[in-house]
């Protein structure tokens, strides 16, 4: 197989924990040909999707873990699979890339995750498809509605719809002297829609990342435990990752969401679960492969490449 990875610049990879690197390393180990490009290197000419991509060889050297060939313009149809691994935010450039992927798919290119799914499954809003699994939630940009929600539930998390890694997340209460300015700031004075969720105290025990590959949950999750004094469990916000077997409730959530993900063509998703509640469905570039692999010995990257190979054979 020829696999094109579209991702952020390689020099930014932290390979000791990078999921895209784990995917590349496993694909390379199996003898697949790997190419790399950034999203801005996609183009359309004469109605055909093209990309300025480099062949990539994974090496055993550190820190120089890759070698790149010359940059060549080639059609996306030249690749067995295109794997989109660019990190959020899902801004206009991300939207344009997803639209180009939809055009490519119409020309027979296999894209993971599909352009349509990237557009339809906003990582914060996707949980609304599963109302029975979520804590009380409000989507709004209106200050009076957000304040009323805070007054009703007393302890609330506010977060934007387009962030990642715990960025711009606030925990607020009705008597917070900064509540008004926090609402003004996060909503851009009512010009931006945000999510409000009732605070789930089980975050103290960890915000669990459950990986779902081709509709099937990986048997271990990664509990991301907040640092002292922190509300956020995200590893990017200083949380500590601890691999754990799925609980019965974790599996129930994953097996409820998994079939819908598969139906929509989402090969890989990261479900975020706090306590008994689903809080996010990450589909752009889910992480935590490496942490689970290192702590359990389970080859999560192998499970992903297995699924990719199956999809490309059909």
UniProtKB/Swiss-Prot annotation:
InterPro entries: ATP-grasp, ATP_grasp_subdomain_1, Glut_synth_pro, GSHS_ATP-bd, GSHS_N, PreATP-grasp_dom_sf. ATP binds at residues 149-206. Its EC number is 6.3.2.3. Pathway: Sulfur metabolism; glutathione biosynthesis; glutathione from L-cysteine and L-glutamate: step 2/2. It comes from the Bacteria. The keyword Cell membrane does not apply. This is Glutathione synthetase. It comes from Chromobacterium violaceum (strain ATCC 12472 / DSM 30191 / JCM 1249 / CCUG 213 / NBRC 12614 / NCIMB 9131 / NCTC 9757 / MK). The gene is gshB.
């Amino acid at each position: 197989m020829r696999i094109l990875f579209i991702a952020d610049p390689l020099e930014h990879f932290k390979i000791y924990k990078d999921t895209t690197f784990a995917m590349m390393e496993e694909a390379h180990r199996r003898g697949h040909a790997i190419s790399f490009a950034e999203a801005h290197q996609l183009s359309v000419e004469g109605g055909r999707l093209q990309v300025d991509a480099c062949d990539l060889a994974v090496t055993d050297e550190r820190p120089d873990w890759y070698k790149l060939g010359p940059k060549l313009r080639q059609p996306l149809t030249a690749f067995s699979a295109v794997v989109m691994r660019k990190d959020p935010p899902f801004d206009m450039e991300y939207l344009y890339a997803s639209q180009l992927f939809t055009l490519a798919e119409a020309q027979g290119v296999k894209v993971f995750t599909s352009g349509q799914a990237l557009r339809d499954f906003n990582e914060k809003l996707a949980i609304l498809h599963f109302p029975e699994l979520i804590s009380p939630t409000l989507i709004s940009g209106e200050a009076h509605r957000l304040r009323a929600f805070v007054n009703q539930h007393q302890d609330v998390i506010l977060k934007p719809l387009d962030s990642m890694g715990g960025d711009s997340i606030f925990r607020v209460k009705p008597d917070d002297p900064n509540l008004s300015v926090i609402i003004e700031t996060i909503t851009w004075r009512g010009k931006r829609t945000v999510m409000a969720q009732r605070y789930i105290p089980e975050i103290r025990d960890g915000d669990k990342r459950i990986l779902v590959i081709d509709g099937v949950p990986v048997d271990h999750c990664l509990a991301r435990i907040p640092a002292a004094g922190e509300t956020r469990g995200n590893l990017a916000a200083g949380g500590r990752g601890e691999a754990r077997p799925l609980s019965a409730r974790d599996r129930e959530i994953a097996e409820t969401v998994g079939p819908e993900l598969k139906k929509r063509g989402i090969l890989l998703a990261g479900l975020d679960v706090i306590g008994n509640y689903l809080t996010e469905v990450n589909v752009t570039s889910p992480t935590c492969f490496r942490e689970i692999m290192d702590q359990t010995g389970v080859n999560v990257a192998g499970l992903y490449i297995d699924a990719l190979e199956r999809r490309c054979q059909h």
